[in-house]
Amino acid sequence: MINTLSILIPTYNNVCVELVKSLQAQASLLYSSSDSLSSISHFEYEILVADDGSTDERTIEGNRIINTLPHCRYIERKENVGRAAIRNFLAREAKYTWLLFIDSNMNVISHQYLANYLKEKESDVVYGGYQIKRDAETRERLKYNLRYIFESAGTQNGNHLQRQANPYADFHTSNFIVKRSILLKHPFDERFSHYGYEDVLWGKTLKNNHIPILHVDNPLGYEHF
């Protein structure tokens, strides 16, 4: 059972205050009620948001409110080091045994999101997947967006059983839990300084080192295309 958790959010030119507030509200409830829950005892958490050298000053200023939230810290970094290096940095900064990595452009769609992860068996890596918003307004707004059309047509990212059939290939860094010791021993390859592929290579690293990935049905929402 997971009872200590560092929630780690890398961000770049994106205000993620609402995401952090949603996560903090769930974590705070678990923290305050942990003594009375038979399945979760002495729950401790932190939420760290690392700004990877954002160039938009309004974005940086907007995210500074995160520092006023309990158990939350907004870390401003001047240099843009890329998706792999910023995740490795967050892992080093974290103080708890388990790390939950979330992309800053995701949104929480379940009130039980954190509780679902805490109840999972202690697999070294657990991936929850993501869910594309498919309401009428979003479909109309993005009807000519090729990436949205492609992602919406797919189902495997929302179906954990299909993902589990090919666990290392169907893995993304947008929503997963990992033991801190695993990531420190097998960090992301920092040669990937731009968008993409760091999760593909890390999946291969896990496979080569016989570290299993458990796929579960615990998605975050995604609508930024």
Language model feature labels by segment:
Residues 23-76:
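Acidic donor-binding segment of Leloir-type glycosyltransferases
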Residues 77-94:
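Glycine-rich, basic loop-to-helix element that forms the pyrophosphate-binding segment
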Residues 146-168:
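Short, flexible, basic/aromatic active-site loop/helix in glycosyltransferases
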Residues 193, 211-225:
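Active-site donor/metal-binding and catalytic loop motifs
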Residues 99:
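Short aromatic/hydrophobic "clamp" motif used to bind/position activated sugar donors
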Residues 111-143:
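Conserved donor NDP-sugar-binding/catalytic core segment of glycosyltransferases
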Residues 5-22, 26:
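A conserved hydrophobic helix/loop-capping motif in glycosyltransferases and polysaccharide synthases
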Residues 195-202:
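Acidic donor-binding loop at a coil-to-helix junction in glycosyltransferase catalytic cores
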